[in-house]
Amino acid sequence: MTILHSTMLSEVLDLESYRKKISDEVRECFDLASQARELGMDVTDKVEIPLASDMAERIEALIGISGIADQIRDLSKKMSREEVSLEMSRRVANIFKDNKKEALDKAIRVGLAILTEGILVAPLEGIADVYIGKNADGSDYVGISYAGPIRGAGGTAQALSVLIGDVVRRELGITRYIPTEEEIERYIEEIESYDRIKHLQYLPTPDEIKLVVKNSPVCIDGEGSEEEEVSGHRDMARVKTNRIRGGMCLVLCEGLVQKARKILKYTSSMHLEEWSFLSSISGKSDDKGSKKSDKFLKDIVAGRPVFSHPSRPGGFRLRYGRSRVSGLAAASLNPATMYIMGKFIAIGSQIKVELPGKAAAVTPCDTIDGPTVLLRNGDHVKINNIEKAKELYDEVVEITDAGEILIAYGDFLENNYNLPTASFTKEWWMQYLPDGLDGNEVDQFRAVELSRQYNIPLHPDFDYYWHDISFEELEYLISAVENGRLSDNSFLIPYSASEVLIKLGVQFKRSGNFLVLNQYYPLLVSLGYDVFEDKIKRVKPYQRKSSVLETVNYLSGITIKPRAPTRVGSRLGRPEKAGDRKMKPMVHSLFPVESYGEARRSILNANKKTDGTYKAEVFFYRCTSCGYESPSPTCPKCGSRSKPIGTKNSEIDLSVILRKAEDRLGIKLDELKEFKGVKKLMSKEKVAEPIEKGILRAIHGISVNKDGTCRFDMSDIPITHFRYKEIGISKEKLSELGYEVKDVNEIFPQDVIIPRKAAKYLFDVSKFIDDLLVRYYGLPPFYSLKSEEDLVGHLVIGLAPHTSGGVVGRIIGFSDVNAFYAHPFFHAAKRRNCDGDEDSVMLLMDGFLNFSARYLPSTTGGLMDAPLVLSVLINPDEIDKEALNVDTLQKYPLIFYEATERHAAPSELEETMMTMKVRIKKTATYRNSSYTFDTSDINKGVLVSSYKTLATMDDKISEQLGLARRIRAVDADDVAARVISTHFLPDMYGNFRRFFSQEFRCTKCNAKYRRIPLSGRCMKCGSDSLTLTIHKGSVIKYLDETLKIEKEYNIPKYLKERIDNLARTIKETFPDEEKPDAAIKITGLDMY
């Protein structure tokens, strides 16, 4: 078979040729999978992932209304996304106007699908129901019942879905919703309760809630999503549940109230006067200023360290710019910083940050500053490379400066966060330098000379953190200088000045009672001194000005800019992730074994235990030749095609099915170490997967996902340019992929770089797919790979959780990191950014051959994370707009840096900063973009966070608090108190309560009991293996660590009292015993 993906290319591909190549290869793969499906050996006879070339096709496939794609395309040429959404809703309502309920339902779902680009599952599952109810006066009203998956749509889309409901209501002539006072009070109580148990991004005031509910022309309703019920306002006629309605709370609070300003723009332009009440809602201000915030410190987790308290000296210094692996919410750090920070920060790790958003994934950039550290020998040095960091790691006693964090302008634009003052850096300083002067190699003397001669600011390498010290410290430093002396091209200053010099960021070596400063001249000049004939002389008398910085400007007679006016607080969020997706427990086949497979769900055990026959609820087929009924689409007795007869609880002859599978595959089941199924099928029809697929997965050691595919999960990180050497491919392979052979290439938007771990897994999956094609379908193999490297050029499907639309990607290489490098457009097409999000890939042929929507769970959220539609090509106009805010300049202009000094709104500079959106508008392409900082190697940095390598929680906590003590910008006592109050105490209190209301579990068949059976035996399988589900160990697991921290750290008195009370209660409840409770087996009436 000739396959396109192996065709050698010699020419460099342009964007159009690249897109055609992707489309052709997808079609080739689709055709082969269709050929296999048509053999009738699957649960459907066609490939179940429809291909979509654009958003309009995705929406048509997702919602299932034929003919709307063309209308969406036409409207999109002349309207904004939101306007298209509202207009299409009107049109769809008119199509179904004879049935008002159906018209409302279809119109609202289509409108929401347009707002979410046809990628999210929210239009299908986020709206549980659309209904027509009755007001007290007998008139009709429209109610929209929201479910949990609406969260994924985002606040604006949530709010606009209510607006769409109102527009359609008017179109159909239905009157408005009129709530009663009691219903309004129910909303207030319910929202406050939801915030307590789940936490809302924005909790409106009772008056704001009342205003929205009273004035909204549409009833914002929801399913009872939480276990907790409201205590008052129960059993109401028009509210179907007493449970808290999560979907309603999200739409009202994070949608209508929080996004009130945005919604008003649309209501005003459409003259919807009934929505003018939103103008009196303050909501949550969209204008974020540059102010100190400790929000990122909330909910600290034990073992995940804090790297800097909010805006604290010594914390990360904000540096504006974009590396080739940052932007789209990802931030870059010097690899040395990753290592020095206890190796907790790895490439792909998530850090929670103070600004501009909530979090960022970390990527490497070795052309920005690393940390400055104090060593055991008294030296104070800056470390700018990871090799030096490894060499000095054990000698570090204090991390006095965390180094720089590189954050792109585009992230401030996306978050609408006013630009904090930039650090004074070399790229800013260079723009003051007169034309023709070389500013690359500037020593300490030349730096001062240039400032004096051209009246430009002092070079940032010799500009210190004057804003971090007090007048008293400045004056102490001056007195120390008076007692210093020049010696061998260095300046010796008394050791007593070390604390001030550390705060200033001055590097030195210790020599006895003196500190040796090699770069001394700019410091002396800054303090009002100069050197004449190897002697230091004061040239300007000391005089205090309004600030220390202004004082050194006066004393030096040159301009000295604030070196690091903005520090960024941060802590570790989620560690990086790269691992194959396994259901819990691991499953090879979506085939039911009920309880006969015991806790391991073993299909082979179920066969032995039942002599091959047992009852299960499953979808059955009847053979068209011999009439035999089984869960297989082909007859396991005679091999003929079977026709579906429906779901029933009936006998499965597993032994017959397995024998037929052995014959068909040419495999003996004795060869399998393990072969696992599922206890029950969760789909609506209870359709079982052909068991042969599971056998082949078991042979290749891979697991199946709920939809029949094999996935690999990874943290998302961006890349816009790559070096072929760093991704493990040759020049020849680079050329074959359609790239020009050069050092750095701009990556195509659908090309992806996967971790080595993913390559190994996908290689195994490719072997499974080839076996499946040859042994099961009787077709030629598709992949025929000899090594993992042969994956290069093959296609994958990228799919994010909470979405229902996959995106085609092409593997072009491999990385050593545990994260997923891809173009910002690729991540955005999946509705993801790079703030710590993760998603998955699967081989394209795996998706086409093995995915079936009939396997998906029927529960709410069952359609999430399933490729219900596939985007073959990426269109920048149809992806999440965050990717269009990525900036593309080679250097930020002077006007930008000066704008940061007045904390300008980022939107003022959008045209200047050439975002992707502006580039497309001005040049009609997003290609030929650039970046401001290079990264020598995208694999250079910590590859695995020490959070994952430290063996025990005690080790993690010890390292977390040890690091807190070493970092100057961290308050270790505060970290200790927060760990106890946000993690340890809630955990112990919660497990203590649950211990006394727990279930009991049979370890053989997993049956659970609210009360222990009087016999002490499992009533289902007869086993005496009953055990607790929550053990004493779960209650006391953090107690010793908590008491230890209480002694070692200065924590608040009230917290100490809480700890002592809980410790006393636990010790009284669980006195020391000879045997731990986990070893005790419950038998007979021992429990009582």
Curated annotation (Swiss-Prot):
Its EC number is 2.7.7.7, 3.1.11.1. Coiled coil: none annotated. One of its GO terms (biological process) is DNA-templated DNA replication. Keywords: DNA replication, DNA-binding, DNA-directed DNA polymerase, Exonuclease, Hydrolase, Multifunctional enzyme, Nuclease, Nucleotidyltransferase, Transferase. The keyword DNA-binding applies. It comes from the Archaea. InterPro entries: PolC_DP2, PolC_DP2_cat_dom, PolC_DP2_central_dom, PolC_DP2_N. GO terms for molecular function: DNA binding; DNA-directed DNA polymerase activity; single-stranded DNA 3'-5' DNA exonuclease activity. It catalyses: DNA(n) + a 2'-deoxyribonucleoside 5'-triphosphate = DNA(n+1) + diphosphate; Exonucleolytic cleavage in the 3'- to 5'-direction to yield nucleoside 5'-phosphates. Heterodimer of a large subunit and a small subunit. Belongs to the archaeal DNA polymerase II family. HAMAP family: DNApol_II_L_arch (MF_00324). NCBIfam families: polC, PRK04023.1. Possesses two activities: a DNA synthesis (polymerase) and an exonucleolytic activity that degrades single-stranded DNA in the 3'- to 5'-direction. Has a template-primer preference which is characteristic of a replicative DNA polymerase. This is DNA polymerase II large subunit. It comes from Thermoplasma volcanium (strain ATCC 51530 / DSM 4299 / JCM 9571 / NBRC 15438 / GSS1).
